[in-house]
């Protein structure tokens, strides 16, 4: 079987389960999720053994320590996957939920009901726990899923999918609703992305190059975010302690993720007080500060910044997703200038303001066009679990129905449902005699 046939085969298997999935009870779905959780614990030693194969191969290829860490599965991470499954099982089932209902003057009752997207292709890198997160969300939302993990985790992903399928068989959940691309042939992905009619949406999770490759080569809709250039603006009316802690948390707590800040924007009236203090703490954490002219001149010889690497910023630094202990600094004269800066250099992911001025905070929320906008809190909270949504499929910056963390509800779409009692458009029904027959021949008329 060549790569094209392979892709079509698994897509058709997934598509063939769509009608069956839509009629599953919540109990059946939860039973499958909870049985998967049990099997993860029962087969933990097998998971770790298969994961070691991936780690050994990755080490031979010279992968970085950071990547090796993302690949690794241990007792703690397996227990976290178990908890994800339990959490998703505990969430309300979105399928079939009526989200709107109204009555028209003619008596028609019109509403919207949540229904599954259909078949979801998720393409991801490095982290095998995504296999469990993605499958669990798709199963609970009655979507079929095609899982395409990275070649570096194929052994880990294979055993995890085998466990999911075992749970499906044991709980009467259609196991072919969970498909796994069990090959490292990259051409399979290219073929999958062309399968309009079989696959309804693709969701890439990984680096910018992967996401761009998927978006540029796909004929099916793609839900994505290219990168997370997140910004923190410290207003001249900011509480200093809040500003310092938020800036430190948003950059240092976990710098390699998409919701960490990359740009620190500071009002000039508070810059002389705030920047030396944050430079001191950034220095202790090993953060390099790439500064505009004003902040560079302020910090380069400042005693508070003596242990901090201070370098001049280049224009391209403000566009960069560093994913590292590096931050670009910009000093501005006004809130409007800060918002303009964020619009130009940000990626519409997550942006925050620190201010004690309510009016300024509300203007920031109104004017900053991002998936998540904060007042007096760290951008690190842009996450399905942190928002109380449960596990997530990823974070979308697209301007579609799914924006921000994509959890259960974002894996459904509304369908109009209409209840009538014999209503007719313009009361035109079967005529009593042929002379009453009237047909509107205007092709453009509705």
Curated annotation (Swiss-Prot):
It catalyses: L-glutamate 5-semialdehyde + phosphate + NADP(+) = L-glutamyl 5-phosphate + NADPH + H(+). It comes from the Bacteria. It is found in: Cytoplasm. Pathway: Amino-acid biosynthesis; L-proline biosynthesis; L-glutamate 5-semialdehyde from L-glutamate: step 2/2. The keyword Transport does not apply. GO terms for biological process: L-proline biosynthetic process. The keyword RNA-binding does not apply. InterPro entries: Ald_DH/histidinol_DH, Ald_DH_C, Ald_DH_N, Aldehyde_DH_dom, G-glutamylP_reductase_CS, Glu-5-SA_DH, GPR_dom. It holds the Pfam family Aldedh. GO terms for cellular component: cytoplasm. One of its GO terms (molecular function) is glutamate-5-semialdehyde dehydrogenase activity. It is an enzyme of class 1 (oxidoreductase). Keywords: Amino-acid biosynthesis, Cytoplasm, NADP, Oxidoreductase, Proline biosynthesis. PROSITE patterns: PROA. Its main location: cytoplasm. Catalyzes the NADPH-dependent reduction of L-glutamate 5-phosphate into L-glutamate 5-semialdehyde and phosphate. The product spontaneously undergoes cyclization to form 1-pyrroline-5-carboxylate. This is Gamma-glutamyl phosphate reductase.
């Amino acid at each position: 079987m060549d790569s094209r046939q392979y892709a079509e085969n698994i897509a058709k298997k997934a598509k063939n389960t769509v009608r069956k999935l839509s009629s599953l009870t919540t109990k059946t779905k939860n039973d499958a999720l909870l049985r998967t959780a049990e099997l993860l614990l029962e087969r933990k030693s097998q998971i770790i053994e298969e994961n070691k194969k991936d780690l050994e191969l990755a080490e031979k290829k010279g992968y970085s320590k950071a990547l090796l860490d993302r690949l690794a599965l241990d007792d703690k991470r397996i227990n976290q996957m178990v908890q994800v499954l339990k959490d998703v099982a505990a969430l309300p089932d979105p399928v079939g939920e009526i989200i709107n209902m109204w009555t028209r003057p003619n008596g028609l009752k019109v509403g919207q009901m949540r229904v599954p997207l259909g078949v979801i292709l998720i393409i991801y890198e490095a982290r095998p726990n995504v296999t469990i997160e993605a499958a669990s969300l798709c199963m609970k939302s009655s979507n079929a899923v095609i899982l395409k993990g990275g070649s570096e985790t194929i052994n880990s992903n294979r055993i995890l999918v085998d466990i999911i399928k075992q749970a499906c068989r044991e709980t009467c959940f259609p196991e072919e609703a969970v498909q796994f691309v069990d090959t490292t042939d990259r051409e399979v992905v290219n073929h999958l992305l062309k399968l309009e009619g079989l696959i309804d949406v693709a969701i890439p999770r990984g680096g910018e190059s992967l996401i761009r490759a998927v978006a540029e080569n796909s004929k099916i809709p793609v839900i994505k975010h290219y990168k997370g250039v997140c910004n923190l603006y410290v207003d001249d009316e900011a509480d200093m302690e809040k500003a310092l802690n938020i800036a430190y948390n948003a950059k240092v707590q976990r710098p390699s993720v998409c919701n960490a800040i990359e740009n620190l924007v500071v009002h000039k009236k508070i810059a002389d007080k705030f920047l030396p203090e944050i430079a001191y703490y950034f220095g202790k954490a090993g953060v390099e500060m790439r500064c505009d002219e004003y902040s560079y001149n302020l910090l380069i010889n400042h005693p508070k910044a003596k242990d901090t690497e201070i370098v001049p910023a280049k224009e391209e630094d403000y566009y960069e997703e560093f994913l590292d202990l590096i931050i670009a600094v910009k000093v501005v004269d006004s809130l409007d200038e800060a918002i303009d800066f964020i619009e130009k250099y940000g990626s519409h992911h997550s942006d925050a303001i620190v201010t004690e001025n309510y009016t300024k905070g509300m203007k920031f929320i109104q004017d900053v066009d991002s998936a998540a906008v904060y007042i007096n809190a760290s951008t690190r909270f842009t996450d399905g679990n942190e928002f109380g949504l449960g596990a997530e499929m990823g974070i979308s910056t697209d301007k579609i129905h799914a924006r921000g963390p994509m959890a259960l509800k974002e894996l459904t779409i509304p369908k109009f449902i209409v209840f009538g009692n014999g209503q007719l458009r313009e009361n035109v029904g079967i005529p009593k005699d042929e002379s009453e027959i009237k047909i509107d021949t205007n092709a453009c008329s509705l």
